[in-house]
C-alpha cells in the first residue's frame, strides 16, 4: 500500500513536469526583436508635481537593490502543493519595434506639464519570509505514481509446518555422557532386609525423664504378709522394774535380720582386671541413636538398571564429533536428608482400661512427702462403728440443761430443834445451781481398734503441684513408637565438579535387623568371609559439651558380716569414735538372704579379654525352668534348610557387608528373544505388596555356641520383655549413718542400661523441671538410607556398537502429528478383531514433548500379539554424540486417505492386572474419632473426713492399756553430725556369690578367626516377582544419518511482516523550481509626495507604445526569465487549472485517508476487526465489513466485531440445521457424520452474502493466518438423545465428535488439545423433552476452526430427534 507521502510526492512530480512542458511551449511562440542603440542621457528636469497614473510602460532597467521591506501580512491560503511560485515581470519588455533615427537637438523647451507617472520600478529585494500560511485544501487525486522501490525485507515468517518424519536412521555411535542430571527425588525405602543376628548389648541409654504420675490403681487384693518391718523407734522408757533374778544363759539366738544397707563407703582401690566373664545376655536393643554426622561421600556404586526406551526425540542438528572421554561411573548415593522436625505432641488419650494387678514390686525408696492436697468434699456418713473401748475422758463439754431433781441426800446431822411447823406443800423446782469446778483430765484411754474400712470417698480435687520429685529409677523401655513420617527432602546442594571415577566401593552397611525368624536346620559351617575394607575416617565431630563428672571407681568387695551380739540394755549414746583403718578383705561368706535392690552402681572399667574356655559336653535337657535372663549371643548355627516364607518382618538395620562370593560359572547363551541374564541390580524399587504368610518352619536344632563375635552396630529397641518373677524378699541390713547430702553432680556420661528398678509408690506430680543441659553427642547412629545418585562421572570411551537388544517396552503413544496434506477420502476400512487385553503396564514417565506429528488415519486393527515376558532392563547406555543429519528419504507413495474408521465397540473388561506398586507412604491421616469411654478409673485418693457420727454412749473407764505399738517411722531427721570413727568391725561371714553383674563395656576385639570352609551352595530361590519398571534410561544413541528427503513443498505465504523501521534519510534533493505565482496581494499604501527635483536634461525620444494583448494559453511568457515567489501577477489565467490540481490532490488525499483509517463499510472495509478498533476506539461492537486478503474489496465479508474482546466473528450459513429423526443407522454404536452422511455431503458453511465458497475459503485462510487464537461453540438440541455424558452409565462413550477445518476430530475425552469443553449439558438423560448441550472449543491453533461437521452416536431410535445450531467462529 502506498503511503500518503509517497503519493503526494508522485503527484507533485507530475505537476511539475507538466508546468515545465507548458513553459517550453510558450517560450517557442515569442520572437525577440533586435536591441536598439542607447540614446544619450538627457538633463534632469525639475521634479514636477505627481501626475496621474500613467499607462503601464515598458519596464525600465533594473534599479539598485532597495532596502528590505518589512514582512508583509500573511497571504491567502496557497494551493496544496506549496510550489505555486509566480513568474516575475522583471525582464526585457516584449514587443517594441525598432528604434527610429536620432532627430536634431531641439532648443530647450519650457517646463512641460507634469509627466505621466513613471513606470513601476523594479521589485525590491525579497522581504523577510512571512509566517507559514494555513494548509491549503486538498488537491484532486493525481495519476498513480510509479512503483516504489522494494521495501526492506520483512521479518522472517513463522516457521513452516514440520516436515514428514523421515525413516529412522541406523544407530549412531555412542555419544558422550550428558552432564549430571539434577538430583532425583528421593526413592522409596528399599525392601526390608533379612533379619540380622541379634546385636551385642547396646550402650546403656540415658535415664529417661520421670514419667507423669499414673492415676491411682484400684485397691489390690490383700497382699501377702510383708517383710519384717524395720525395727521401730524405741518406745517410751517404761518404769524401771524391779531387778529380776539372773536367768541362765540362753542359747544363741538366730541370726538377726540384716539392718538397712549402710551408706556407701569410701571408694576402694581399683582392683585388677578380672577374667573375662561369660558373654552377657543380649540386652534389649537400645533406641535408635541420633543421626550421625554426614559421612564422607561413599565410593561410586554399581550402574543402575537400564531405563525404558525414551520417546523418540526431535532430530538434532549435526554436532561436531567430540573426543570420547573415559567412561564415568555413576556417582555415589548422597547422604540422607536431615531428620524432620519432631511432630507436635498429640492430645492426651482417654483413660485406658485398668490392667491386671501386677506382681508386688519391691519396696521403692520413700518419696518426699507431697504437699497437702486441697480438702476434698465430705464423704457420706459411715455406718455406725462397733462399740469402741472406753476413750480417754473428754474435756468438759458445755453446761448441760439442768438435771432432774436429785433424790434426797443422806440424812444430815441433827439441827437445832426448830419449832414444829405445819407441813407445807411441795415447793417449786429450784433454780439451776452454779457450774461445778472443772475436774482434772482423766488418764488416756487405750487406742481403739481400727474401724472398718469406710466406703470409697469421692475423688478429691487435684492437689497443688508438689515439689519436683527426685529422679525416679529408669523405667522399663517403652514399646517402639511408630516410625515418623519421612522428613522433607533437604535443600539441593550445589553441583560439584565432575570427579574422576573412583574405585568400586565396598559393600553397604548391614541392613537393619528384622524380626527373629524361626531357627533353620543346622547347616555345615561356612567359611568366614574376608575382612572388609576399613571405612574412611569420618570428619572430626564438633566440640562436644563439657563432659560430666568422671565415673566413680568400683566398690571393693563386701567385708564379712559380723554376727549380731546379744541385745544389751540401751546405753547412752557415746561420742562418735574415730574412724578405724579399713580392715583387710575377708573371704566371701556364704550367701546371705537377698537384700533390697540398691541403686544402680556406676560402670566399672572393662577387664581384659580372657581366653575362651573349652566347650563342655551337652547335658541332658532339664525341665523347663523359669524364664531366665537373656543368654549370650551364640555363634551362628549352620544354615538350615529354607523354611517357608514368613510374614514380612519389620525393617531391619543394615546387615554387615558379606564377603565377595566367588564368580559363578558362565551359563550357556540362551536363544535370542528370551530374556537375557539378569542385569546389574537396579535402584531399589517401590515396596511391593506383602506376600502371603508362609507356614512356620520346623524349629532347627541349636547350633554349637561360637566364640563371641564383635559387637554389632547399635540395634533398634527390642520389644518389651515379660515381667520376670519377683525375687525372694531379702532381710533388712543394719542401718548406716546418714551422710550429708552431696551437691548435685553434673550429668554423667551415658551409663549402661540398668536393670529395671522396682516400681515405687506413685508420688505426687512434680512440677516440670527446667530443661537439662544438652548431653554429649550420642554414639554414631546406624547407617542412613542410601542417598540419591551422585553426579555423572567423566564420559567413557565410546564402546563398539552392541548387538541389537531385545525389544523395549512399548512406549506411550506419541502426540498427534501435524496435519498432512488433504488426501482424497478413501474407502472405510474393515473393523479389526478385538485384541486381547494386555497386562497393565507401569505408567512410563512423561516423554519429551515431540513436535506435532501428522494425523494418521486409523488403520485396521492388527491381530493381537501374545504378551511376551517382561524383559529385564538393560544397563543405560551413555549418551551418544548426535549423529550427522541424514539425507532426506525418497518420498513414499501417497496412500489413499481412508475414511475415518468408526469407533470400535468397547472391548470386554480386561483381566485383572497384577497388583500395582505400593505407593509412597501417605500423609498422616486426620485424627480419628474419639474412642469409646474408658472403663471406670481406678480409686481416687481418700475423701475428706466424714461428718462427725452421733455421739456414742459414754464408755466405762478402761484399764490402763499396755504400751502402744510403735508409731510409723517419722520422717528422716536432719543429718546428724558425723560420728567419730568407730573401731574396726570384725570381719563378717563370707557373702554368697552375687548375681551376674551388668554387662561390662565392650572388651577389645578378639583375634581374627581362621577362614572357614566354603559353604554349600544355597538352594535355588523361587523366581522373584517381575521388577518394577525402572527409571528412564539415558537418551538413546542418535541413529545414523538418514537419506536426504526431497525438497518439501513450499509453505503457505506467511503473513506480511510488521512494517520495517524507517529507512535512512535520502540525500537532500535539488532545489525545486519556483512555484506558481501567488494571488495578487493587497494594494500598497500610497507613497508620500516627493519633493520637486531639479529640471532634468531633455529626455530621450518617447518610449514605444504598450505591448499588445497577450496571446492566450498559459501565460508563462518570456517575461518569466527568473522565478520569483513574492511578486503577484495580475492575470487570472492560472486559476481554473489550479482548481483542477487542487481538486485532484484533495481527492487523492481522501483516498489515502480512507486507506489509513478504514470505515468498516463495504466500499472501505478493514482488514480485521482489530484494525477497526485501533482506528476508531470509540466505536461499539456491531456488524462491519472486513477484507482479510486485502486487494479488491469485491470479496469483502460482513462479520460481527466484538470490540470488548478484540475478536472477529464469522457466522455460519445457515446457523440451524433442521431437526433429524428418521436416520436409520447401518450399524449400531457408530458415530454418524451429519454433513457427510445424513445431509448427503453438505458440511457446515460460512458464506457471507455476495461471496462465493472459494472466496470465503480464501478469506478464512487469511483470517487463520492473521489470528493466533480461535474459538467456537455449537449447540446440540436433543430429544431423547445423549450428546456428551450419559447419566445412566456415567460414561462419555456416546459423546458427539466434531470435525475441525484441518480434518482434526475433536472429542470428549483423550488428548487435552483435541478435547472440547461442555458449558451446558442438558442432553445427559432421556426425558421425552427437548433440551440442549452447549459445546465450546478454544485453541491457539486457528487452523482447527471453524467446525465443518458433527457426528452424534445416540440417534436413529424411535422418539429420538436432534438438530444442531452452529455458533460463530471467532478469531483473535
From Swiss-Prot:
Q: Which GO terms describe its molecular function?
A: extracellular matrix structural constituent conferring tensile strength; identical protein binding; metal ion binding; platelet-derived growth factor binding; protease binding; protein-macromolecule adaptor activity; SMAD binding
Q: Which GO terms describe its biological process?
A: blood vessel development; bone mineralization; cellular response to aldehyde; cellular response to amino acid stimulus; cellular response to retinoic acid; cellular response to thyroid hormone stimulus; collagen fibril organization; collagen metabolic process
Residues annotated for Ca(2+) binding in this entry: 1187, 1189-1190, 1192, 1195
State where it is primarily located: secreted
Which positions does the record annotate as the modified residue Pyrrolidone carboxylic acid?
A: 23, 86
Q: Where is this region: Disordered?
A: 28-1135
- Which residues are annotated with the PTM 5-hydroxylysine? 183
The yes or no answer to whether the keyword Transferase is present is no
Q: Where is the composition biased (Basic and acidic residues)?
A: 147-161, 744-753, 1011-1022
Record's signal peptide: 1-22
Disulfides per UniProt: 1169-1201, 1209-1370, 1278-1323
Q: Where is the composition biased (Low complexity)?
A: 95-146, 231-260, 285-299, 306-327, 336-348, 390-416, 476-495, 519-537, 600-639, 674-716, 725-743, 755-771, 792-801, 855-882, 891-927, 957-978, 987-1007
What name has this protein been given in UniProt?
Collagen alpha-2(I) chain
Q: What organism does the record attribute this protein to?
A: Rattus norvegicus (Rat)
Q: Which lineage?
A: Eukaryota, Metazoa, Chordata, Craniata, Vertebrata
Amino acid at each position: 500500500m502506498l503511503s500518503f507521502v509517497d503519493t503526494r510526492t508522485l503527484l507533485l512530480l507530475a505537476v511539475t513536469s507538466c508546468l515545465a512542458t507548458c513553459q517550453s511551449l510558450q517560450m517557442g511562440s515569442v520572437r525577440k526583436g533586435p536591441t536598439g542603440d542607447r540614446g544619450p542621457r538627457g538633463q534632469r528636469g525639475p521634479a514636477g508635481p505627481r501626475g496621474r497614473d500613467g499607462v503601464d510602460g515598458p519596464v525600465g532597467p533594473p534599479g539598485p537593490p532597495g532596502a528590505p521591506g518589512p514582512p508583509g501580512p500573511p497571504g491567502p491560503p496557497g494551493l496544496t502543493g506549496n510550489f505555486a511560485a509566480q513568474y516575475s515581470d522583471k525582464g526585457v519588455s516584449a514587443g517594441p519595434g525598432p528604434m527610429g533615427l536620432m532627430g536634431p537637438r531641439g532648443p530647450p523647451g519650457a517646463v512641460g506639464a507634469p509627466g505621466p507617472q513613471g513606470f513601476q520600478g523594479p521589485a525590491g529585494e525579497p522581504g523577510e519570509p512571512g509566517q507559514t500560511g494555513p494548509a491549503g485544501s486538498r488537491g484532486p487525486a493525481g495519476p498513480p505514481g510509479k512503483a516504489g522501490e522494494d521495501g526492506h525485507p520483512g521479518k522472517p515468517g513463522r516457521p513452516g509446518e514440520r516436515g514428514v518424519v523421515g525413516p529412522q536412521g541406523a544407530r549412531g555411535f555412542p555419544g558422550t555422557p550428558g552432564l549430571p542430571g539434577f538430583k532425583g527425588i528421593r526413592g522409596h525405602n528399599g525392601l526390608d532386609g533379612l533379619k540380622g543376628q541379634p546385636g551385642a548389648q547396646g550402650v546403656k541409654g540415658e535415664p529417661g525423664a520421670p514419667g507423669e504420675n499414673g492415676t491411682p490403681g484400684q485397691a489390690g487384693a490383700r497382699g501377702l504378709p510383708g517383710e519384717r518391718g524395720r525395727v521401730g523407734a524405741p518406745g517410751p522408757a517404761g518404769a524401771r522394774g524391779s531387778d529380776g533374778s539372773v536367768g541362765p544363759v540362753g542359747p544363741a539366738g538366730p541370726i538377726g535380720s540384716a539392718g538397712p544397707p549402710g551408706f556407701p563407703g569410701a571408694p576402694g582401690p581399683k582392683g585388677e582386671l578380672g577374667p573375662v566373664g561369660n558373654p552377657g545376655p543380649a540386652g534389649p536393643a537400645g533406641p535408635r541413636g541420633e543421626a550421625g554426622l554426614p559421612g564422607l561421600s561413599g565410593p561410586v556404586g554399581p550402574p543402575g538398571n537400564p531405563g525404558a526406551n525414551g520417546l523418540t526425540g526431535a532430530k538434532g542438528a549435526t554436532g561436531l564429533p567430540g573426543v570420547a572421554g573415559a567412561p564415568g561411573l555413576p556417582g555415589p548415593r548422597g547422604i540422607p536428608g536431615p531428620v524432620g522436625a519432631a511432630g507436635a505432641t498429640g492430645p492426651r488419650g482417654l483413660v485406658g482400661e485398668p490392667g491386671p494387678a501386677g506382681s508386688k514390686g519391691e519396696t521403692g525408696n520413700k518419696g518426699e512427702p507431697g504437699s497437702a492436697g486441697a480438702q476434698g468434699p465430705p464423704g457420706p456418713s459411715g455406718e455406725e462403728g462397733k462399740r469402741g473401748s472406753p476413750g480417754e475422758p473428754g474435756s468438759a463439754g458445755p453446761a448441760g440443761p439442768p438435771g432432774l431433781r436429785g433424790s434426797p441426800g443422806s440424812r444430815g446431822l441433827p439441827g437445832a430443834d426448830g419449832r414444829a411447823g405445819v407441813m407445807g406443800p411441795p415447793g417449786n423446782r429450784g433454780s439451776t445451781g452454779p457450774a461445778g469446778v472443772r475436774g482434772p483430765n482423766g488418764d488416756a484411754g487405750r487406742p481403739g481398734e481400727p474401724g472398718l474400712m469406710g466406703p470409697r470417698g469421692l475423688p478429691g480435687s487435684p492437689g497443688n503441684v508438689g515439689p519436683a520429685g527426685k529422679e525416679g529409677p529408669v523405667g522399663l523401655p517403652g514399646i517402639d513408637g511408630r516410625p515418623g513420617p519421612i522428613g522433607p527432602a533437604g535443600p539441593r546442594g550445589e553441583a560439584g565438579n565432575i570427579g574422576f571415577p573412583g574405585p568400586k566401593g565396598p559393600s553397604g552397611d548391614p541392613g537393619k535387623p528384622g524380626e527373629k525368624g524361626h531357627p533353620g536346620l543346622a547347616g555345615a559351617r561356612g567359611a568366614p568371609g574376608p575382612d572388609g575394607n576399613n571405612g574412611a575416617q569420618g570428619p572430626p565431630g564438633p566440640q562436644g559439651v563439657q563432659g560430666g563428672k568422671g565415673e566413680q571407681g568400683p566398690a571393693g568387695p563386701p567385708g564379712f558380716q559380723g554376727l549380731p551380739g546379744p541385745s544389751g540394755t540401751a546405753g547412752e549414746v557415746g561420742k562418735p569414735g574415730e574412724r578405724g583403718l579399713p580392715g583387710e578383705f575377708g573371704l566371701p561368706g556364704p550367701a546371705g538372704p537377698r537384700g533390697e535392690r540398691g541403686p544402680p552402681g556406676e560402670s566399672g572399667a572393662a577387664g581384659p579379654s580372657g581366653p575362651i574356655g573349652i566347650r563342655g559336653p551337652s547335658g541332658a535337657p532339664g525341665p523347663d525352668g523359669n524364664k531366665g535372663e537373656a543368654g549370650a549371643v551364640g555363634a551362628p548355627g549352620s544354615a538350615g534348610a529354607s523354611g517357608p516364607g514368613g510374614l514380612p518382618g519389620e525393617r531391619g538395620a543394615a546387615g554387615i557387608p558379606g564377603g565377595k562370593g566367588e564368580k559363578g560359572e558362565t551359563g550357556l547363551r540362551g536363544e535370542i528373544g528370551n530374556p537375557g541374564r539378569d542385569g546389574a541390580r537396579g535402584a531399589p524399587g517401590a515396596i511391593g505388596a506383602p506376600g502371603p504368610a508362609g507356614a512356620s518352619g520346623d524349629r532347627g536344632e541349636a547350633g554349637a555356641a561360637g566364640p563371641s563375635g564383635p559387637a554389632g552396630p547399635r540395634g533398634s529397641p527390642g520389644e518389651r520383655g515379660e515381667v520376670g518373677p519377683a525375687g525372694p524378699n531379702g532381710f533388712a541390713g543394719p542401718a548406716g549413718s546418714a551422710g550429708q547430702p552431696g551437691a548435685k553432680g553434673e550429668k554423667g556420661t551415658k551409663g549402661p542400661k540398668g536393670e529395671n528398678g522396682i516400681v515405687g509408690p506413685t508420688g505426687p506430680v512434680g512440677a516440670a523441671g527446667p530443661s537439662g543441659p544438652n548431653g554429649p553427642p550420642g554414639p554414631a547412629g546406624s547407617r542412613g538410607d542410601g542417598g540419591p545418585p551422585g553426579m555423572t562421572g567423566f564420559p567413557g570411551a565410546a564402546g563398539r556398537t552392541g548387538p541389537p537388544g531385545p525389544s523395549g517396552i512399548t512406549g506411550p503413544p506419541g502426540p498427534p502429528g501435524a496435519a498432512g496434506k488433504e488426501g482424497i477420502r478413501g474407502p472405510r476400512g474393515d473393523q479389526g478383531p478385538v485384541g486381547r487385553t494386555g497386562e497393565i503396564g507401569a505408567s512410563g514417565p512423561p516423554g519429551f514433548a515431540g513436535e506435532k506429528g501428522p494425523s494418521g488415519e486409523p488403520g485396521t486393527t492388527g491381530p493381537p500379539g501374545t504378551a511376551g515376558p517382561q524383559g529385564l532392563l538393560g544397563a543405560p547406555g551413555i549418551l551418544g554424540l548426535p549423529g550427522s543429519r541424514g539425507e532426506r528419504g525418497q518420498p513414499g507413495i501417497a496412500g489413499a486417505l481412508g475414511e475415518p474408521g468408526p469407533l470400535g465397540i468397547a472391548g470386554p473388561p480386561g483381566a485383572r492386572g497384577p497388583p500395582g506398586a505400593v505407593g509412597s507412604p501417605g500423609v498422616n491421616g486426620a485424627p480419628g474419632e474419639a474412642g469409646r469411654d474408658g472403663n471406670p478409673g481406678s480409686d481416687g485418693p481418700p475423701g475428706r473426713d466424714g461428718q462427725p457420727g452421733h455421739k456414742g454412749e459414754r464408755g466405762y473407764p478402761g484399764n490402763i492399756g499396755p504400751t502402744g505399738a510403735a508409731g510409723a517411722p517419722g520422717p528422716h531427721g536432719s543429718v546428724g553430725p558425723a560420728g567419730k570413727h568407730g573401731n574396726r568391725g570384725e570381719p563378717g561371714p563370707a557373702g554368697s556369690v552375687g548375681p551376674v553383674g551388668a554387662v561390662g563395656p565392650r572388651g577389645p576385639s578378639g583375634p581374627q578367626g581362621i577362614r572357614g570352609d566354603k559353604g554349600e551352595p544355597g538352594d535355588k530361590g523361587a523366581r522373584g516377582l517381575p521388577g518394577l519398571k525402572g527409571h528412564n534410561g539415558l537418551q538413546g544413541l542418535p541413529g545414523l544419518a538418514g537419506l536426504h528427503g526431497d525438497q518439501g513443498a513450499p509453505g503457505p505465504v506467511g503473513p506480511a511482516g510488521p512494517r520495517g523501521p524507517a529507512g535512512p534519510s535520502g540525500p537532500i534533493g535539488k532545489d525545486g523550481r519556483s512555484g506558481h505565482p501567488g494571488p495578487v496581494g493587497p494594494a500598497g499604501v500610497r507613497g508620500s509626495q516627493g519633493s520637486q527635483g531639479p529640471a532634468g536634461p531633455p529626455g530621450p525620444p518617447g518610449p514605444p507604445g504598450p505591448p499588445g494583448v497577450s496571446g492566450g494559453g498559459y501565460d508563462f511568457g518570456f517575461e518569466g526569465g527568473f522565478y520569483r515567489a513574492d511578486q503577484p501577477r495580475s492575470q487570472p489565467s492560472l486559476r481554473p487549472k489550479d482548481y483542477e490540481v487542487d481538486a485532484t490532490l484533495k481527492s487523492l488525499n481522501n483516498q489515502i485517508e480512507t486507506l489509513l483509517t478504514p470505515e468498516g463499510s463495504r466500499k472501505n472495509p478493514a482488514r480485521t476487526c482489530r484494525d477497526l478498533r485501533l482506528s476508531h476506539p470509540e466505536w461499539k461492537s456491531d456488524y462491519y465489513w472486513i477484507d482479510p486478503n486485502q486487494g479488491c474489496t469485491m470479496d469483502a465479508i460482513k462479520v460481527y466485531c466484538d470490540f470488548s474482546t478484540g475478536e472477529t466473528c464469522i457466522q455460519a450459513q445457515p446457523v440451524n440445521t433442521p431437526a433429524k429423526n428418521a436416520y436409520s443407522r447401518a450399524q449400531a454404536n457408530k458415530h454418524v457424520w451429519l454433513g457427510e452422511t445424513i445431509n448427503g455431503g453438505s458440511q457446515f458453511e460460512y458464506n457471507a452474502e455476495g461471496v462465493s465458497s472459494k472466496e470465503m475459503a480464501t478469506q478464512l485462510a487469511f483470517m487463520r493466518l492473521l489470528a493466533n487464537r480461535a474459538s467456537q461453540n455449537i449447540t446440540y438440541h436433543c430429544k431423547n438423545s445423549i450428546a456428551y455424558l450419559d447419566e445412566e452409565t456415567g460414561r462419555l462413550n456416546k459423546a458427539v465428535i466434531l470435525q475441525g477445518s484441518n480434518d482434526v476430530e475433536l472429542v470428549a475425552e483423550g488428548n487435552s488439545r483435541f478435547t472440547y469443553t461442555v458449558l451446558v449439558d442438558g442432553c445427559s438423560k432421556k426425558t421425552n423433552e427437548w433440551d440442549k448441550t452447549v459445546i465450546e472449543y478454544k485453541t491457539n491453533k486457528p487452523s482447527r476452526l471453524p467446525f465443518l461437521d458433527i457426528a452424534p452416536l445416540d440417534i436413529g431410535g424411535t422418539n429420538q430427534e436432534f438438530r444442531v445450531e452452529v455458533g460463530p467462529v471467532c478469531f483473535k
